[in-house]
Amino acid sequence: MDKERISYHESVQKMYERIKADNMTNVWDRYEAQGIGGVPDRRCTFCMAGARCDLCSNGPCRSDASKDKRGVCGITADGMAMRMMLLRNVMGASTYHYHTDQTIRTLRETARNKTPYSIREPEKLKTFANRLGIDISGSDAEIALNLCEFVEKDFNRPAYEPSRIVEILAPPERKKRWEELGIFPGGIYGEMMLSTSSCLTNVDGYYVSLALKAMRLGIAMAYQSQIVNEYCQDVLFGIPRPHTMRVDLGVLDPEYVNVLPNGHEPFLGFAMVQLARKPEWQEKAKAAGAKGLRVIASIETGQEMIQRWEEDDVFYGFTGNWISQEAVLASRCVDLFAADMNCSLPVAPLYAEKYNFKLMPVSDLVAFEGIEERLNYDPVEAEEQAAKLLDMAVENFKNRNSSGEAALNFPAGEAVVGFSTESILDALGGTLDPLLDAIKSGAIKGVVGMVSCTTLRDYGQDVHSVAVVKELIKRNILVLSMGCGNAAMQVAGLCSPEAREYAGDSLKAVCEALGVPPVLSYGTCTDTGRLADLLGAISGALGGVPVPDLPVAAAAPEYMEQKATIDAIFALALGLYTYVNPVPTVTGAPNLVKLLTEDCREVTGGLLNVETDAVKAVDGIEQHIMEKRKKLGI
């Protein structure tokens, strides 16, 4: 297989050869076995077009818009495609909110002094509570408890009762437009019920109605789930601030006990770092024959952690995104893989057996065939649970290398991570004016929020994302990166000071003056909400310029799963030009395609652009940014 069909990253390319030599199932070979993209392509053309449905016993049905061929119930291809998209959106929103629910649970128990965590950012707690209209005259614990009560009450509002969180946090112009469209949301639970119920057979088959419900759900998700989640995690674990972090597979050293918290929830990861930094745990590891004990960040759980806590010899580094997972597990450097919500592959038990590591589900969402033992996260028991996990890892080290050699000599780079609204303001001297001045002068043409996964659909891991971002910064467009795509940028070296050499002259000069890279590591996919709040602040700083008129865009060069689809729908509701790749499974729905790629501009101000070529994709983004600059007279 061609190296670039595997991955952009040399480390993963090399590990693929090891995995092949070991005759292990892997994501690349499984992709090829599906016949996807082959000649001929063996995918079902109706499935690829989104023109099929199997929700009821009359089906499976296929539809063809060119012949007005409908499902047995009478639903059109447009309705089929959008209904399935809305169901994906519900899955994405639900999973985002599961994380939020666990964060609020953790904050409440921390306020009651029942967890190993603390309120690390009392000022952030007060600032956020004050924005929500919560009394901040009491103790930090009282404020935190009142905050938990306030947001949970809002989450549980019925869909017909407007969300207070959205009312308070969203930009005024956006709220007005959402009210006009009838998509101002209620509570997130009510919105998920409304959306899911709408997808029942013979309920809502109208693609426009379904699309508006998707936007409504996306708005509720972004403000209630994402913003509340990230800001409350800031309160508990720290506001992201810039610092360097080791990245890539070279952070794995087989002579250490290596623990990998993996998924999207950082709670047990942070608890393990706190314990592992204590001398007694290092001594336990050394008594087992290791040089020490390390916690290695992985995927989005790791991204949440590295944004907030600095590296040392215990919290040692970050591996990469989800397609790197089998490469990491096959390294024979892992002792414990703690799998929380999201992004732990179903084949992990096969890798655990082959490469001698302990696989432990730590979320009630996660299960693996053949793995009966589990340790579901409980904030009150978090320290005890973390200790059990570290003990498992130390015990595993004794036998890890009994049946094979570890992979050695992999590269490790450095990335600057930890950008947030607060840290950007700090870098700018406490005001957005320097950034706005750079945009007004043209030194920075515009800003792109890159919220992406990684996928093998058209290219190897991260190949397309890196190509798009390199092209953006070459054209003096600043990038804020989030999600698995953020890991792509970090490991590819684009979040380092040296990446300024890829930037256009004026962006390079701004980055040098501010001491930042041209790609700002802005967090996880959940930080989409944080980005929306930043755009609201920029809109306000410019005197209320509508978000659709800002020289900004969203990009998902390698979206993959259901969370990504709700992020994209929210971006459209927010009024953003939104670039996505691969081609979504809606091409058999011509009216829906027209709605998303043309008519949406008149509805919300947003627009979906789909393009598989990196240069053409950036051409579209740049053209949009230049049009907005012209409209603003800058």
Swiss-Prot record:
Instruction: Write out the catalysed reaction.
Output: CO + 2 oxidized [2Fe-2S]-[ferredoxin] + H2O = 2 reduced [2Fe-2S]-[ferredoxin] + CO2 + 2 H(+)
Q: What class of enzyme is it?
A: oxidoreductase
Q: Its Gene Ontology molecular function terms?
A: 4 iron, 4 sulfur cluster binding; anaerobic carbon-monoxide dehydrogenase activity; hydroxylamine reductase activity; nickel cation binding; peroxidase activity
Q: Which residues are [4Fe-4S] cluster 1-binding?
A: 44
**Any one Gene Ontology biological process term?**
generation of precursor metabolites and energy
Q: Carries keyword Oxidoreductase?
A: yes
**InterPro entries per the UniProt record, alphabetical:** CO_DH_a-bundle, CODH, HCP/CODH, Prismane-like_a/b-sand, Prismane-like_sf
The Swiss-Prot or TrEMBL note on domains reads: Cluster B is an all-cysteinyl-liganded 4Fe-4S cluster; cluster C is a mixed Ni-Fe-S cluster which is the active site of CO oxidation. Cluster D is also an all-cysteinyl-liganded 4Fe-4S cluster that bridges the two subunits of the CODH dimer.
Entries under NCBIfam families matching the protein: CO_DH_cata
- What PANTHER family does the database record attribute to this sequence? CARBON MONOXIDE DEHYDROGENASE, HYDROXYLAMINE REDUCTASE
| Identification of the protein by name | Carbon monoxide dehydrogenase 2
